[in-house]
Design a protein with these regions (language model features):
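Iron-sulfur-cluster electron-transfer modules
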Residues: 2-188
């Protein structure tokens, strides 16, 4: 990310200062390549550690949006976005596969014997895609579930009705898909 910001500074200097950045969404590949933009994991560590308080991630995501609008996404990014759109998660797993870990740990699932009314519970535990599908994420979700049980908190998970928050789509630069997934969440009052 530091190199991208440095290249953006050089681009602005070579093209009349910061006003050049206002009119250009993305400098040509001579300045910043798509490979450089997608090499960033968008973990935000650079933003947290930057002594100059530069928002590198915001600039990178904005340039990714431009690439997406121009139809320049390829490979893994395209497949991930397709899976998000069709299956509601970045891996393309079926929604019914979100809960096997919960059954093993006796975690109540809304609409599956736990009742259909979210108001019956103190907490609706949002596991997210990682917590639902990834083995390491399932371990974390199981541990949190155990802590909630020990604390006497009445909780449930959404199970198959839970979908992705859309964060991977936003980070890849696909704002429209992010908005669509976010709208789905707002319809279920989250």
């Amino acid at each position: 990310p530091r190199d991208i910001v440095t290249k953006l500074r050089h681009f602005a200097t070579a093209n009349g200062g910061t006003d050049a950045m206002k009119n250009e969404y993305l400098p040509s590949e001579d300045w910043v390549t798509p490979e450089e933009l997608y090499a960033c994991t968008t973990c935000s560590a650079c933003v947290e550690q930057c002594p100059l308080f530069i928002d590198q991630m915001g600039k990178i995501i904005e340039m990714r949006r431009f690439l997406t609008m121009e139809g320049q996404l390829t490979g893994t990014a395209v497949r991930t976005l397709q899976k998000l759109g069709s299956h509601g998660n970045p891996w393309g797993f079926e929604s019914g596969d979100r809960t096997p870990w919960a059954k093993e740990n006796e975690v109540p699932v809304l609409g599956n014997g736990a009742g259909n009314n979210a108001e019956e519970f103190d907490v609706i535990f949002w596991t997210g895609c990682f917590g639902a599908y990834d083995p390491r994420g399932q371990e974390v979700a199981s541990t949190i579930s155990e802590l909630l049980k020990e604390a006497g908190v009445k909780f449930a998970i959404m199970g198959p009705s839970e979908t992705c928050t859309g964060d991977p789509a936003r980070r890849l630069g696909e704002e429209a898909l992010f908005q669509e997934l976010a709208m789905t969440l707002s319809l279920i009052h989250i």
